[in-house]
Structures are given as C-alpha cells and as structure tokens.
Amino acid sequence: MDSIKIALQYMLPKHFLSRLVGKFAAAEAGAITTAVIKWFIKQYKIDMSEAQQPEPEAYKTFNAFFTRALKPELRPICQESNMMAHPVDGAVSQCGPIEAGNIFQAKGHSYTSEALLGGNKTDAARFDGGDFATIYLAPKDYHRLHMPITGTLSKMTYVPGDLFSVNPLTAQNVPGLFARNERVVAIFETEVGPLAMVLVGATIVASIETIWSGTVTPPGGKQVFSWDYPTTGPEAVTLEKGAEMGRFKLGSTVVMLFAQDAIETFADGVEPGETTRMGQPFARLKQQ
C-alpha cells in the first residue's frame, strides 16, 4: 500500500491540484467555507480553544482559518538568552550535524545543503560543519512560523520544484525530497552567524508567505529568483526571537541550517518523532 501511495504522487498533477485548492482556500464561499472548516476541525481533531478566534463562522476563507492566530499566552517564548526557541508547532523529522555538506533526510536518503539552498555554493559554504533541524507541520498544527533567535534578513531565494507530500512516509521514500520540492529560503544574520529558514512547499500547499514580502509568487518556470536585503539602516528587516516570520497556506515543512559552532546542543526532547511547540527551548547557543 505504501508503494502505491508513493507511485501515485509521481503520477498526480501536483501543481494543478495545488493551484485548484489554492483558489478555493482563498475564496469567500460563505456557508461552504464554514462547512469545510468544520469538517477539517473534526477530521484532524483541532483544538480551537487555543485559537484567538475559536468560532469557525468567523473565518471568511479557509486560508484565514488555516493561518489562524493562537492566544499568545499559550505559546510563551523561552527567555533564556543562550537558548533558541522552537519556531513552529510540529514534529521533529530529523536533526543533527551537516556532514561534508550533506543533510540526513531518512534512512538511505540525504541531500546537500547546496541543493537545498537553490544551488548556491557560496550560501551553502556558510553552513559547512554546522547543524540542521527539519520540522514537519501536520494539517492539525498551527501554521505560522516564528524566529528561533533574533536575526536580520540578508537574502531570500525562491526555488521552483516539485510538490510532493512531505509527510514521514514520503520523506522515507522520495530521494532528496526537501531539495526537490518548491521552497523559499530566507537567510538571516544572527549573533551566532547565519541562519537559513527554508520553507518547503508540498502537495496542496497553495502558497508560502513571509512577513516582509507577503505571498511569494515569482513568475512560472524553472528559474531561481533571489533578493538581497540591507542589514543596516531604516530598511533592514530585523525580527526578534519569537516574532512571526512567515506562514504556510496549507501545511508543510521547515528546514533550518545553523553555522558551525552556533549550537552547543539541542534541547531535551528535540529528536526525531518528538512533538514541538513554538516558543519552547530548542537549542542551546555555544559560547562565542
């Protein structure tokens, strides 16, 4: 059965399906939208008591529901100055060292940081000998992404690609999954060196949004697009630890890359299969 599910993913018109779902998710369809939201809540056992707006009828579009805000007191940001915070609600897929430029995906599968970052050798070299963490956001999860550490945006890259599902089954069976799916790469300058936040698209992920640019919608085709940002002056984009940096309009995965000697150790419970909650301790910074 698993092999059939994987084979179907290769065969399905994933981009067409994602565009179709995206149009509905953005539509104000009244009672139809509310009915779909209620079904989704029941199907995925979503705890709406955590939402700032718990009533399904309050959301005009499915996207508004899916990217709903939570009550801030439910996700306090860890205050230790030498500790990064979890950026999302989700589950750890993998984490560990970047070895010879390779990132572990699942048993028998890895991919390179260069491929993940859109083929840019210079960007990839900044993370040689560093660490990575991959976190999967299930449909039931809160889908806003937050900063694990204070950082100033220096570059954003859009990388076109496939739209395979990014669930654990697919990660175990599709080679180089996160380096072949459509994705947005944001590189920040932090007190412990560069941080890459890679927002990976997936089947039915209608779009990826960042705080500074809105929905990332480059022209179609296979070209990689990059934007450089000033790191000083009034136009610099600096986000504090715990600040929102982006959203998935339908769920996916975030891959984070850290420079060599940025992380001393991951926090307790940060290991494959473990649940994450935004704001909780994520990794201890190495003394600089």
Curated annotation (Swiss-Prot):
It holds the Pfam family PS_Dcarbxylase. Catalyzes the formation of phosphatidylethanolamine (PtdEtn) from phosphatidylserine (PtdSer). It is a peripheral membrane protein. InterPro entries: PS_Dcarbxylase, PSD-B, PSD_type1_pro. Its main location: membrane. This is Phosphatidylserine decarboxylase proenzyme. GO terms for biological process: phosphatidylethanolamine biosynthetic process. It comes from Shewanella frigidimarina (strain NCIMB 400). It catalyses: a 1,2-diacyl-sn-glycero-3-phospho-L-serine + H(+) = a 1,2-diacyl-sn-glycero-3-phosphoethanolamine + CO2. Binds 1 pyruvoyl group covalently per subunit. The keyword Acetylation does not apply. Is synthesized initially as an inactive proenzyme. Formation of the active enzyme involves a self-maturation process in which the active site pyruvoyl group is generated from an internal serine residue via an autocatalytic post-translational modification. Two non-identical subunits are generated from the proenzyme in this reaction, and the pyruvate is formed at the N-terminus of the alpha chain, which is derived from the carboxyl end of the proenzyme. Its cofactor is pyruvate. PANTHER family: PHOSPHATIDYLSERINE DECARBOXYLASE (PTHR10067), PHOSPHATIDYLSERINE DECARBOXYLASE PROENZYME, MITOCHONDRIAL (PTHR10067:SF6). It is found in: Cell membrane. NCBIfam families: PS_decarb. The record marks 251-252 as: Cleavage (non-hydrolytic). Pathway: Phospholipid metabolism; phosphatidylethanolamine biosynthesis; phosphatidylethanolamine from CDP-diacylglycerol: step 2/2. The modification Pyruvic acid (Ser) is found at residue 252. Heterodimer of a large membrane-associated beta subunit and a small pyruvoyl-containing alpha subunit. GO terms for cellular component: plasma membrane.
